[in-house]
Amino acid sequence: MFKSGFVAILGRPNVGKSTFLNHVMGQKIAIMSDKAQTTRNKIMGIYTTETEQIVFIDTPGIHKPKTALGDFMVESAYSTLREVETVLFMVPADEKRGKGDDMIIERLKAAKIPVILVINKIDKVHPDQLLEQIDDFRSQMDFKEVVPISALEGNNVPNLIKLLTDNLEEGFQYFPEDHPERFLVSEMVREKVLHLTQQEVPH
């Protein structure tokens, strides 16, 4: 039996969504920069084995929009919820819950789909601080699961993938391969530009 499904990764800017996706896929498919909102596209990372396929949809970092483009990007991120079976809501272990997190939580409650809370950057905090973070977020919403990880180091990422695959429904293989190499190269070039230039780069 082959299992498949779509999974969205939501979270505030720079919480490690792209780092997680890149670790899972083993290649750089989402640009990483210290500028917020640098992941423009619903970049799909496709995790495929002989028995399952997870199609990851990475969203623009959700923020309080200050421009029409920013507003479009936020709504684009939320529109993803209509296309997936499960949401990974990613938050950083080393930052307290903020207004941006609360805004996302309210949207997720309204969406009424399974949400897994992924607490990233656990390598940066003491276990006691991690437990406080888990309790705080659990007090706000009933999550299907809570999974602490370090996307950068890969800690507990395999367990998260297993959790996702265990909950997939029977289905077919949506995609035979990942994004075209041309797309990957163009995104890597744009990342270099963002890192090297001190001027305003459209992003």
UniProtKB/Swiss-Prot annotation:
Era-type G domain span: 3-170
Annotated spans, G3: 58-61
Protein topology in the membrane: Peripheral membrane protein
Annotated region (G1), positions in chain: 11-18
Keywords tagged on the record: Cell membrane, Cytoplasm, GTP-binding, Membrane, Nucleotide-binding, Ribosome biogenesis
Chain intervals for the UniProt region annotation (G5): 149-151
Subcellular location: Cytoplasm; Cell membrane
Binding annotation for GTP: 11-18, 58-62, 120-123
Cross-referenced Gene3D superfamilies: 3.30.300.20, P-loop containing nucleotide triphosphate hydrolases
GO cellular component, one term: plasma membrane
GO process annotations (BP): ribosomal small subunit assembly
One Gene Ontology molecular-function label: rRNA binding
Region entry G4, spans: 120-123
Annotated segments matching region G2: 37-41
Role played: An essential GTPase that binds both GDP and GTP, with rapid nucleotide exchange. Plays a role in 16S rRNA processing and 30S ribosomal subunit biogenesis and possibly also in cell cycle regulation and energy metabolism.
PANTHER family, A to Z: GTPASE ERA, GTPASE ERA, MITOCHONDRIAL
UniProt subunit comment: Monomer.
Family in the record: Belongs to the TRAFAC class TrmE-Era-EngA-EngB-Septin-like GTPase superfamily. Era GTPase family.
UniProt-listed NCBIfam families: era, PRK00089.1, small_GTP
Protein name: GTPase Era
Source organism of the structure: Streptococcus pyogenes serotype M49
Gene name tied to this protein: era
